[in-house]
């Protein structure tokens, strides 16, 4: 079998990223490797800021006005940044360590932060970062993609239920005819269940 296939929609590991990409594209910003990197950067930076706010004695001198600049690192995280993280990872052979080094490079770019760089990832394991990133990915994808789409389905069902509330239909119980109902009432049951 061919070992080094170029990645595209036909060679993706799953049809979710191939055949069904048009249906799942909105989820890429939450579940792609790029997204995981962005969430990891966010967790690392917010943790660093939290250490500054404690204040951890060694970080008392960190200029708090730079917090927004630090947050811009994940807010503006790009595919180019993700590619750079992959380059770092090719040397470190460790995905979370590559994120740490990436953030240290950003500290260098800001300038004057050398004394604080060793507190990036301070007291953490990779799983601390992952076990925070993954729930955030799930929570935000549900809130920003899934629930709004589900609400559209519920709204459409409720609209049909209202429109069809006067249309009579025979109900059944245990496969036998029962008291009459309305099509609208029965459709509203499905909206309620969702």
Regions found by a protein language model. Name each.
Residues 4-193:
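A helix-coil-helix interface module used to build multimeric assemblies
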């Amino acid at each position: 079998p061919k070992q080094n296939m170029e990645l595209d929609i036909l060679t993706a590991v799953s049809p979710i990223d191939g055949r069904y990409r048009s249906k799942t594209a909105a989820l890429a910003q939450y579940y792609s490797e790029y997204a995981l990197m962005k969430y990891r950067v966010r967790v690392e930076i917010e943790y660093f800021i939290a250490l500054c706010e404690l204040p951890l004695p060694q970080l008392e001198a960190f200029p708090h006005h730079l917090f927004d600049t630090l947050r811009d690192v994940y807010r503006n995280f790009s595919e180019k940044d993700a590619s750079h993280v992959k380059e770092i990872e090719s040397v470190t052979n460790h995905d979370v360590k590559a994120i740490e080094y990436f953030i240290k490079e950003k500290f260098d770019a800001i300038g004057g932060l050398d004394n604080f760089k060793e507190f990036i990832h301070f007291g953490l394991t990779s799983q601390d970062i992952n076990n925070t990133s993954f729930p955030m990915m799930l929570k935000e994808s549900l809130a920003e993609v899934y629930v709004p789409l589900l609400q559209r389905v519920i709204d459409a069902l409720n609209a049909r239920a209202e429109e069809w509330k006067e249309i009579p239909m025979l109900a059944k119980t245990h496969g036998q005819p029962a008291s009459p109902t309305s099509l609208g009432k029965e459709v509203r049951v499905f909206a309620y269940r969702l």
